[in-house]
Amino acid sequence: MTVVGSGVGFWALVVVATLVGLFTAWTLGANSNSPPFAPAIGANAISTMRAAFLIGILATLGALTQGGSISETVGSGLIDGVAITSLAATAGLLTATAFMAFGVYSGYPVPAAFATTGAMIGVGLSLGGTPAVDTYRQIAVFWALVPPVSGGLAYLTATILRRDDIPETVGVPLLAALVGGIVANVRLGVIPAPSGADQGSIAGLVAGVVRTPTVAGVDLGAALVTLLVAGASFQFIRRRTQESVDQGVRTFLVLLGSVVAFSSGGSQVGLATGPLENLYRVELGLPGIALLAVGATGILGGAWMGAPRLLQATSREYAQLGVRRSIAALVPGFVIAQAAIALGIPISFNNIIISGVIGGGLAGGSAGVSRRKIGVTVTFWLLTLVTSVAVGFVVYRAFAAALGV
């Protein structure tokens, strides 16, 4: 292992940067992981404390097994020509955390991904780096597509669940089949990828072990595993709904909340660990899993210590939404979060859920959807991105001047 730098100042920055990263992860664990189980609590399918416990465990597992791609993007993909130093990482994390804290205490919608992305671009430019325009273009397109795609999927889901000619003993199991099929193809760091990629999926692993032909670019083995998992999911929830519709829906809410919480951890941890990528993996020579473990620890602490209070508040809101609209909001959240993880795109999980809630609300009429609130939300998203770039730039320059770097 090669350690770059050995002075007291260097190690002091390592400690400070790590502590700030832990606090950022704690904040994300407390604030970004409550939506998955809120509908289940509102439907009396699970208690608040048990939900908080599961959120912590599942989000931590998601962070450890899926957090690497977004962490790498935040740490090295936003700026070209320079490496993020420990001082720059500290400045970027402090800037992003300050924006998140402002959002929590003011009540204004401040997306964590926008704040972190902007802050890291700012400190990178302050270091003398050049903008990674291609990466910005990919991120911008993905972010722009999130509201219509999440809202559209939620609208479609809510519409299907509201149709009288589609009984809940069919509609809910069909959604379970969709989720199960996606789970079979979720990329996990603990599963070896036959293609040599960093992460593999259950379907991909089976396809690599059992040789099957490929038709139109689709591996039949992977497709068969996907169909089997989807079919098993459909049959399990269908049996539950046939015994009792309410019990079946509650079971689906808990299982859906579980996979969404897992995805939330995988999509959010990179916002806390990304700025530390160069410090841990290059300067300290540590493996990526060590850095993800730091972030996962923060998310676990935040979920267990901060989530119960937020769960009680959000569960009341989801109870007012109703079961159908709650499911409609969570299904797109799972799909889009997994797409972001696969592409390495930093994303704020709450943004996806907000768009899903709006889409589900439109399925029942637009009376509950405030255009003014939507406008204020989008405005603050854009303001967060722009101002975090400027603040990150200034904060790093101030730190560098104060320390004589």
Task: Label the model's feature ranges.
Residues 1-405:
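Hydrophobic alpha-helical segments
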